[in-house]
Amino acid sequence: MSITRRTTLSKYLIEQQRETHNLPADLRLLIEVVARACKAISYNVSKGALGDALGTAGSENVQGEVQKKLDILSNEILLDANEWGGNLAAMASEEMETFFPIPANYPRGEYLLVFDPLDGSSNIDVNVSIGTIFSVLRCPDGQQATEQSFLQPGTEQVAAGYAVYGPQTVFVLTTGNGVNCFTLDREVGSWVLTQSNLRIPEDTREYAINASNARHWYEPVKRYIDELNAGAEGPRGENFNMRWIASMVADVHRILNRGGIFMYPADKRTPDRPGKLRLMYEANPMSFIVEQAGGAATTGLKRILDVQPTGLHQRVPVILGSKNEVERVARYHEQAQS
């Protein structure tokens, strides 16, 4: 009987280390630890009501958002998995107001890990796909991290990825050499390579936006969406479909597989706080992944990966996905400025 040879995440990373010589061993180990933590989160998510982890925790995070029990548990899983391995100088999370330095009793490394432990957690109780998003940076101060150490533009990321906890659990990764997708084989507990070198089509007929906010949009976004909604009779001459899951990982994963544009723009409700999504652990890693897959990502006025962070929890407008559509929206913003 022949054995089916499959490429696991560990094998893939080791091969990348040998072939490209730009994947250091400690970065490889860090990615494997994050992936292992995502397996633990997936297990807890899948238990649902049986695991007594649904519902709110009776607390709020630094953004003033009500924390779900699984938000807190997922954050603890990632901290516990990564604090002792010697690969990190510090971590930062959506669920923590300030950064988490590696305790003095553990060895420290040269990387910084930033993550949203459970993106889309408002969907937990209704069994919609949710996920984990992460970004890896080098610590510019060696092994002594400060909050300033984290405030690097997205172009400085050395790795980024996300896990989706849905019908299958998948782990999507880039180290700056394309985008690959691994599916969790629950029988043996391994991440198995199932999609290589993912590419986002440059054109699309699908868009993702929360249309209930239409009355608050600025003119460039309103103009773009009005054109799409006009369909074949409008200026675009074709029909478009809207898809909105309200879970960034799920929406972006769909776009990564079949194209589309995802939009969470700034609007008139909070002119002093542009956008809702966080730059460091949502917009930057997703933009890195999307660009590596041939797509584009912008705030409307600037490439997201070029934005200089001013704080760990800074928010930005996010428009990403199929390149030609993203560039069209950016063009409308430029025209509105002139």
UniProtKB/Swiss-Prot annotation:
UniProt main location, coarse: cytoplasm
Molecular function terms from GO: fructose 1,6-bisphosphate 1-phosphatase activity; magnesium ion binding
Pathway in which the depicted protein is active: Carbohydrate biosynthesis; gluconeogenesis
Enzyme type, top EC level: hydrolase
One cellular-component annotation, GO: cytosol
Q: Which NCBIfam families match?
A: PRK09293.1-1 (NF006778), PRK09293.1-3 (NF006779), PRK09293.1-4 (NF006780)
Name under which the protein is recorded: Fructose-1,6-bisphosphatase class 1
* Source organism of the structure: Burkholderia mallei (strain ATCC 23344)
